[in-house]
Amino acid sequence: MPFHLNKVLLRKGRLEVLPTKSKICILGLSRVGKSSLLSLLQGRDIAEEADPTVGLEIEDSVLNGRKTSIWDFGGQERYRFMWQDFLRGAGLTVVVCDSTEENIEKTKEIYGKFSRYLSSKIIAIANKQDLPGALSADQVQKKLGITTYGMSAIRLDLRGRIRRILEYEIDSNK
């Protein structure tokens, strides 16, 4: 079982981790709704046009009564070099796509590149299910080959759904 961490130190050019709590990593290409999913989970209002995440944002939450660090990775190509180091120690990795054919194919490439660094359980969120032409979660799952849940991160009525998904997947990771 992977260890869980909250803090990363850079010492003598090497990353060191301090184990303290559960860790969930959220990754995907830019503009797929990773930060919106995190805002939805945390109970914040969702901005219609959110600024892209720069590098990495880490927030704490409580899932299943346990403290959990949620790592929201910037999806721009210039930040992806950090992913392999920051994926270490995750108990759950959530791959987010925007449910379009083009994005799913690019997500599959990215996932393939970084999957060797993942020691955690991996799921996908097929976000933006509310948009015309969105592929269903089942279609996305067939293309990615990992358990996939449909979502629309801008729908406040789905706040409980993202929480239930993460809590279920964390518990089933034991």
Identify the function of each model-found stretch.
Residues P2-E49, V62, T68:
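Conserved G1/Walker A P-loop phosphate-binding module
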Residues K21, R66, G89-L92, L118-I122, ...:
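Short glycine-/polar-rich loops that comprise or flank the Walker A/P-loop
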Residues G65-R80:
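Switch II (G3) loop of P-loop NTPases
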Residues I70-W71, T93-D98, A124-N127, G150-M151:
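Conserved beta-strand segments of the P-loop GTPase G domain that flank and frequently precede/overlap
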Residues G75-Q76, E101, D130, R155:
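Short, glycine/acidic-enriched loop or turn micro-motifs at the edges of active sites
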Residues Y79-E101, Y111-Y117:
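Inter-motif core of Ras-like GTPase G domains
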Residues S99-G145:
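Conserved C-terminal guanine-recognition region of P-loop GTPase G domains, centered on the G4
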Residues P132-K174:
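Canonical P-loop GTPase G-domain recognition
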